Amino acid sequence: MIFRAVEDADLIARVKRGDVEAFNVLISHWEKRVYNYLLRLTGNPDDSLDLSQDVFLKAYQNIRKLDDAAKFPSWLFRIAHNEAHSLFRKRKPEVGVDDPDFVERERAHWFSPDLTLAVSAALDRLNADQREAVVLKVYQGFKFEEISEILSCPVSTVKSRLYTAMDLLKNELAPANARGSR
């Protein structure tokens, strides 16, 4: 991870000097993580792909404003967060997973089918703020401070959202896990 941060810092410096190929390499480092993050927020592969393209376009247009290359991951995910929430505002009634079986298919290699359905349903029952905190921490591996930057809220709020969400998930999934392990 440290090597990646050093390499990304070098690429960012090159992009700021006008090296487009360096930005293409930077995209290749981050496109899957950004896409997966957006996919977990939107539940729609097409929207996630479109949003990913918008995220990287905005990142390219604004990378000169990034003062600290070490903050690139949280800066990039902040752009992704903003783009997703902009889409949600435009489509208020449509927010949520369009294909209820999608999450099950994606996680099939991690869980038993029964538990996969239970996890999907439990995540869907979290409010949007809690779900996003879980996605950023559990699925994307961000630290509390980075999530705080991405969501523009205090670290204490991030922790509260995450702990509340995890407690809700634990309580909801305990019966499902007991069924899935039989």
Set out the residue ranges of the language-model regions.
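C-terminal edge and immediately downstream basic/flexible tail or linker adjoining helix-turn-helix-like DNA-binding
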Residues: 1-5, 14, 43, 95, ...
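Short, charged helix-capping/linker segments at alpha-helix termini
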Residues: 1-3, 16-25, 35-54, 155, ...
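Amphipathic, Lys/Arg- and hydrophobic-enriched alpha-helical face
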Residues: 27-45, 62, 123, 172-175
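Residues within the DNA-recognition helix of helix-turn-helix
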Residues: 30, 161-168
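Arg/Lys-rich amphipathic alpha helix in sigma70-family domain 2
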Residues: 61-68, 78-97, 164, 170
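Short, basic/polar amphipathic helix motif occurring as a linker/hinge flanking DNA-binding modules
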Residues: 77, 87-114, 181
